[in-house]
Structures are given as structure tokens and as C-alpha cells.
Amino acid sequence: MRKKCIVIVGPTGVGKTRLSIFLAKRLSSEIISADSMQIYKYMDIGTAKVEPKYQRVIKHHLIDIVEPYENFNVEQFKNLCIEKIEEISSKNKIPIIVGGTGLYINSITHKLEFNAVKSDDKLREELENISLQYGNEKLHEILEDIDPKSADKIHMNNVRRVIRAIEVCKLTGHKFSEINDKFDHYNDDYDFYIIGLNDDRQVLYERINKRVDEMIDEGFMAECKYIYEMTDENSQSIQAIGYREAFMYLNNKISFKDMISLMKKNSRKYAKRQLTWFRQDKRIHWMNLKDFREFEDIEQICLKNVKEWLYDKR
């Protein structure tokens, strides 16, 4: 019998963490984070990391496992996540994977071998030099010439991802977007119940804007300064939305006002990209907050549906 696993996805600021904690309490589950930035230590405010009081009540995995100056990739996540799924399942508990990093989620819910294309250090160094000498826009133009579909999906400031896409194209002769299309193959090694949360776009965007203001009030800039001391501008960790803009401000490249504006703008764009990504998976059971009076209604419906799925009552 296939092991069962609950997955909760959706854009930033929609309530994924809240729903995961609600379900975990009532199902005696453990939670696996699928957030590419919550893996980093000390990056708490900017990643909306689960508060310690909740982590003490419910076991959370794959949070605070990497130093900010270290690199971490999706293949490493996949391997660790599978380990945790097996570990939690061995205790007769249901794992709950929650996060908004589409590639991390798909590495588990879909079939794709990430080690099929190895890195080329020489090529990577050449591409990094192009970025340093001519800027991210020039590097992004190279990707646009060879793989327009990937260029459309990957922001030019996500240098690490742009380089990887170019690298795959040049090493394999195939477009990076074509390889990603293999995500159409679902992973049937596990029995997944995937919940997708969404909301009215304007309401979601207003919540995101408010969240940025709250981050600043909670001491986000002090957090950034602390991380800044142990990283450099090429560190993978500070490519995250919020941190990237903060470091531009700390390096006197933009004003504080422009930093706030960019953080909000880029967070909204990211939420839009997240929805576009997740909508490709037809297995997702979508719950739109605008269709319910209270979030508690969504919690109760999800709990009911999950229990029916767990015990095969439908």
C-alpha cells in the first residue's frame, strides 16, 4: 500500500502555515517545510518562518538546516524530504508537506531526476563573469535567445536559476523548459492529497503589502544586517525576495522608500507566478478564501475531506 501524504500549496500570504498547523494538531501529523528560504538559519522575519511556540507543539522538518552562506538545491531537498516522509510514516503518522516553492513541491509530487544534468564549473564561471561584468539583464538576454519560455518564467535577478537554465541548454542541447515539462509525469510512489489555497487577487495583494510593512516593524532590517555580515551578494540565500531588495538598500543602490516599494511589487509578482505554477497540477483541490466567510470554514472542510481520503470513505 502506498504511503499517504498531505500537501498544502498556494501563493505567499494565503494561510498555508495556519492550515497546516490546524490539520497537524487534529491528525497528530508532522510538518515538512517546502520553502526554499526557510531552510536557512536566522532568516526568520523575511521568510515568515513558523513561530517557535508552534514548532514546540508540532514537529517541523527542514527548517533552519542550512547556514546563510551555504548553497542548497532542489535535489538535496528532494532527498531529505523523502527521508522525512519515510521517517514520519514509520511512526504511523501522516506527513504534511507545506510550502510555496513550486520546484520543491514538484520534486516530490512529480517524477524528475535532477542528477541527470551535472554542473559544468567552467561554463558556470563564464556565465557568472558575464553577470558581474555586464549585469543580470545581459545574462537573461542569453537565456531569452536560447529558451524564451524559461526566460519568461525566470526573473533576471534570479541569477542562480538563469545560469542553471543556460547551463542545461548548452550541456544537453535541450531547452530547460522542455526538461521542466517532464513535471507532467506524476509521482505515484505516494498517495498525495493536495490542497491549494487561493484568494481574491486584490485582497491577496493587499495582504502581501501589509505583510511587508509588518516585516519592517518586526525588525527585518536588523535581521538583514546580521545576515549581510556572513554572506556576499552572490550568496544563494539573499536572492530571496525581501532580502535582495534590502541588500540593495544597504549597499546604497536604492532608497528606503524604493526598497519597500520593490519588496511589495516583487512579492506580488511572485504570488502570481506561484499560482501559475500550481494551476498546472490537476490533482489539486482548490479552496478559494473569497468563497468562505471565515478561514475556520476552510479548515473544517479540509479536515473533513482529508479524513474521508485517509479512511477511503468516498
From Swiss-Prot:
Residues that bind ATP: 10-17
UniProt record, GO biological process: tRNA modification
InterPro entries tied to this protein: Dimethylallyltransferase (IPR039657), IPT (IPR018022), P-loop_NTPase (IPR027417)
Residues involved in substrate binding: 12-17
EC number annotated for this UniProt entry: 2.5.1.75
Residues annotated as site: Interaction with substrate tRNA: 101, 124
UniProt-annotated stretches for the region Interaction with substrate tRNA: 35-38
Intrachain disulfide bonds: none
Catalysed reaction, written as an equation: adenosine(37) in tRNA + dimethylallyl diphosphate = N(6)-dimethylallyladenosine(37) in tRNA + diphosphate
Cofactor(s), names only, from the UniProt record: Mg(2+)
GO molecular function annotation: ATP binding; tRNA dimethylallyltransferase activity
Alphabetical keyword list: ATP-binding, Magnesium, Nucleotide-binding, Transferase, tRNA processing
Free-text function comment from the UniProt entry: Catalyzes the transfer of a dimethylallyl group onto the adenine at position 37 in tRNAs that read codons beginning with uridine, leading to the formation of N6-(dimethylallyl)adenosine (i(6)A).
Family classification: Belongs to the IPP transferase family.
Subunit structure comment from the entry: Monomer.
This protein's name: tRNA dimethylallyltransferase
Organism: Finegoldia magna (strain ATCC 29328 / DSM 20472 / WAL 2508) (Peptostreptococcus magnus)
